[in-house]
Design a protein with these regions (language model features):
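Class I S-adenosyl-L-methionine-dependent methyltransferase catalytic core
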Residues: 1-208
Length: 208
């Protein structure tokens, strides 16, 4: 039996290292089927030896499946673990948005408005279908400010998960060295964001 290794609620390393620890820590048995539903360039898996099924809406990244993650071509109760990393900025497909967001998220944003929460319910519904009972959903999410209003994205994500049979079981804060702030905002009346969250969901009404 492997010796217990505690996992800190604050993470200072990169996402790939954190995901490896998370995958060893939370699932009740070693996961066999892992789907990254927002694969992009695969940065979460650099150096990993795990077999990952990659999904992305943008074909330029050569994912295993080119599709919208709200309508994935998998059987019901197919996967042990899903990974979800939605866009962190509002209107990230607009003409004046930074190129890095288009490069990172491809065509994932086709909506307009003050927040990204309209994407949560369609994804959560599909994630609930694709995951096995007791399966795990690991979501990276960042709160933000748009139109001078704070966007509580991680809370909206948790509330969305509840609608479709998920329980939010844990939260890891990932600390950053630089803030996630648009370069056009030199002054702001909100605290700069130097962190994001990894929310740990289980497709169950319990966590333990």
């Amino acid at each position: 039996m492997n010796q217990y290794q505690p996992l800190s609620s604050v993470w200072y390393g990169n996402d790939a290292e954190l995901l490896e620890q998370v995958l060893n820590f939370y699932p009740r048995s070693p996961p066999e089927t892992i789907i990254d539903t927002t694969f992009n360039k695969g940065r979460f898996w650099k150096g990993s030896e795990r077999k990952i099924i990659s999904v992305d809406i943008d074909p330029q990244y050569n994912p295993d499946f080119v599709c919208n993650n709200s309508d994935m071509p998998f059987l019901d109760s197919y996967a042990d673990v899903l990974i979800y990393d939605p866009p962190h900025l509002t209107d990230c497909d607009t003409q004046n948005s930074s190129k890095i967001w288009k490069d990172r998220f491809g065509l994932t944003s086709n909506f307009k408005g003050d927040n990204i929460c309209s994407t949560f319910d369609p994804f959560m519904k599909e994630a609930s279908r694709v995951l096995k009972p007791e399966g795990m959903l690991f979501c990276k999410i960042t709160d933000g400010v748009h139109n001078h209003r704070f966007q509580w994205n991680h809370i909206d994500l948790i509330e969305s998960g509840k609608k479709f049979g998920f329980t939010a079981c844990d939260c890891i804060i990932k600390a950053r060295k630089v803030s996630m702030t648009s370069s056009k905002w030199q002054k702001a009346h909100h605290a700069r964001r130097y962190h994001c969250y990894w929310i740990i969901f289980r497709k169950s009404n319990r966590c333990e």
